[in-house]
């Protein structure tokens, strides 16, 4: 349930504001129920890559990482602990490190909206509406993935259509990537190696 009044969340003095940290702050302001302050810190001395540390000091909590993405993952971890009734005791710190650097989802979605071996309806990507219309589901998708540490996604079927590398489709892909990027998610495409021939009308 969203808070009626925003929680007390701030960045450390040495931490620069970014789109990713804005998301972490917003999530905590909306859903953190703790009475104390939450401090977000990005430090080069912190846990490497996307790892993070959560430290409880009285009523206050500090989330720290070597990266913005790590702080975002820490925010989601803190909210998950709150939901599960597993909050840290005073003076206790917990450190988490992902086992894999790339944690990727691979879609088997086609440009026409069908999904190869798909059993849950049509593709979430509305290629016919992009780039003019951007579904709010894209950000919810990014949010859900970031909350469990997913940091990469392949948008299309491994049996790729050449048109995925057309100028028009790449403009649409760029719009999706722009939505996913602040959530720490990199965008990938499967490619058909005959695309230059198919799109450029090259002879063999």
Locate the predicted segments by residue.
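Feature activates predominantly on carbohydrate-active enzymes
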Residues: 27, 46-204
């Amino acid at each position: 349930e969203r808070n009626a009044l925003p929680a007390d969340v701030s960045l450390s003095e040495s931490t620069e504001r970014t789109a990713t940290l804005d998301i972490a702050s917003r999530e905590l302001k909306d859903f953190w129920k703790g009475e104390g302050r939450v401090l977000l810190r990005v430090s080069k001395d912190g846990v490497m890559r996307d790892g993070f540390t959560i430290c409880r000091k009285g009523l206050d909590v500090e989330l720290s990482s070597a990266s913005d993405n790590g702080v975002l993952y820490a925010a989601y971890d803190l909210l998950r602990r709150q939901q599960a009734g597993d909050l840290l005791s005073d003076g206790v710190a917990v450190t988490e490190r992902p086992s894999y650097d790339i944690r990727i989802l691979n879609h088997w979605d086609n440009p026409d909206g069908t999904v190869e071996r798909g059993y849950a309806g049509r593709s979430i990507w509305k290629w016919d509406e992009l780039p003019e219309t951007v579904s709010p589901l894209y950000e919810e998708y990014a949010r859900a993935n970031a909350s469990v540490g997913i940091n990469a996604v392949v948008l299309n079927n491994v049996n790729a259509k050449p048109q995925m590398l057309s100028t028009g489709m790449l403009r649409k892909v760029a719009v999706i990537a722009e939505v996913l990027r602040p959530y720490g998610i990199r965008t990938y495409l499967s490619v058909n190696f005959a695309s230059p021939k198919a799109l450029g009308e090259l002879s063999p």
